[in-house]
Amino acid sequence: PGISNWVASSFTLSTASYTARWRGVNRPETGIVYIRGIYWLLMPEYKNRNALSANRPLPNYFWTANTEMRCLSRAIEQSLDHGYAHHIQRLMVIGNFALLTGLDVTEVCDWYLGVYVDAYEWVELPNTLGMALYADNAVIASKPYAASGKYIQKQGNHCQQCQYKPTKVTGPDACPFNSLYWRFIDQHLDRFGGNPRMGLVVANWRKRDPEERAVIVQWA
């Protein structure tokens, strides 16, 4: 009962935080209380969740940053060198890549916990497993934080110095995030088709020529 009340209070506080922001008051501590409440309510079972059946081994370059994808290389390199990275680097570059390629959930969570100096499991696990990897099936996030190369291009200048082009989907010089993104959508069409926040993306993919879709998925 105590834990249930804690989580219930967290939901109330989260709602209050949105109201406060509309009034010009920022209360980030309410989100922290919510995440901590989820952790204490759902652990230890939560740690084993893998809604998308992601099980590919963590690539070696997560420990060397030796990849030709510049945004990913720089994000990993900075993380290894400093034990820190910007939120966008953690979620929308490294986390996004792990999500799109179906990297093993436990291995990814352990990497985040071991690499970042500000990582405590009670806050790292829900953010990585739930938000970045969508492995908890919408407990934390109502949609997967999946994005193509065009989104990453808007977040920085790495694409200007990268051999891959964010405007291309297939081909040797195409940004891998693009084909991986559409393969991810194709792989989980049934799951995301009923999600209102994913409906437009799913509909656009289904409208594409079947041969074009097959080429993109194969390239990914």
Which residue ranges define each predicted feature?
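C-terminal catalytic domain of photolyase/cryptochrome flavoproteins
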Residues: T12-A220
